Amino acid sequence: MSFQRYVRPASGHVAAAPASLGALPVAASDTTFLLPLSGQEAFWIGLSVMGGVRARLLLTAEWRNGRTTRFRSVLVPPARVVAGVTDGQGYAVFDATLAWLSLHAATACRVEVVGATEYAARTGCDAPHPPDPAFAYGGWRLP
């Protein structure tokens, strides 16, 4: 699983997962994982499994306004991407209005979405650089 960043569209919606500007770092805290996200970016979730195994992922998003969104289960493969929340206008993006993601597959984990400054303070790691469209994945094969 990876969290692929991109510049947040002003509309707050995308038709499909945009080109990735790179994976966001994830750090472990005492009880959860931390995901740094600035106000000008959003992310989609990349999914993969190894060795021909199939996995079912259950995902719950908890927003800062108190709203909770439970997704239908996602079977990997064939699914490779969770672009956002389907809402009839495409996908509402995962952005800084998201507080938590709860992920359940073989085990459960919670991912807390925090600002870059808070991420650096809580982890001692450098905050990621601001998103830059010059770093967009162009479709070439990776090694």
Task: Give the positions of each predicted feature.
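Intrinsically disordered, low-complexity segments enriched in small/polar residues
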Residues: 1-143
